[in-house]
Amino acid sequence: MKMTENELIENHQRYLERVALYGEFGYDIEKERSFIIEKARPFSGNILEAGTGKGYFTLALAEAGFNFFSFDISAAEQRYALLNLMYYGLQQQVTFSLADVENIPCDDGFFDVIFAVNMIHHLSSVRTACNEFIRILSPSGKIIISDFSTEGLAVIDKIHECEGRKHELMSGTINEAKKVFIERGFNIREHKSIMQDMLVAGRIAV
């Protein structure tokens, strides 16, 4: 996929403008992403980011020094993510693919760590997605689910409104994910920041 220098610069400028806009509403993107990574530690092995989006968490994970896989259903969204990585020279750390979270093309037990950040609220079937995560998780691996808190969603709604858009929500919640993991016998550890609700789930103590 060829990118021009102008594309890199323009995309990065849009990224900085969005970070600044979030900051105006009290949402520190970099701080929230760092919170998720720190609460997920320690982790290593085969790492998956489920739901690339525009790549805000992708960038944070790459900047933290990790090599990982990332999939999304949208090639257009992944292009934004790749442009941002290329701006910082981090594109070699991420292997992108297109996939549906309800039918992930991956062997059973392949991933040691699975991140799903700010994705659950876009899902209509959290149970199906979580069961897919469990299927592709290694026996000693862990799944990290993080999504906007009530306060975070309120901020995101305001930001979308400022941009003349509407933040589309499906029915998925982090509590639904927690219920599935408990039913499957997983151990759960929970964390919360002002803007994020987060859980870490694993078959062994997490």
Where are these regions (language model features)?
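C-terminal alpha-helical "lid/dimerization" subdomain adjacent to the S-adenosyl-L-methionine
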Residues: 2, 12, 18-26, 144-201
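Conserved class I S-adenosyl-L-methionine
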Residues: 1-43, 87-88
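A short glycine-rich, Lys/Arg-flanked "PGG" loop and its adjoining helix->strand segment in the class I
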Residues: 127-139
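A short acidic, Gly/Pro-enriched loop at the edge of an enzyme's catalytic core
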Residues: 102-113
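Class I SAM-dependent methyltransferase SAM/SAH-binding core
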Residues: 48, 54-103
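A short hydrophobic/small-residue beta-strand
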Residues: 68, 143-144
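Short N-terminal helix/helix-N-cap motif within the alpha/beta-hydrolase-1
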Residues: 124-128, 153
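A short SAM/SAH-binding and catalytic strip from SAM-dependent methyltransferases
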Residues: 113-124
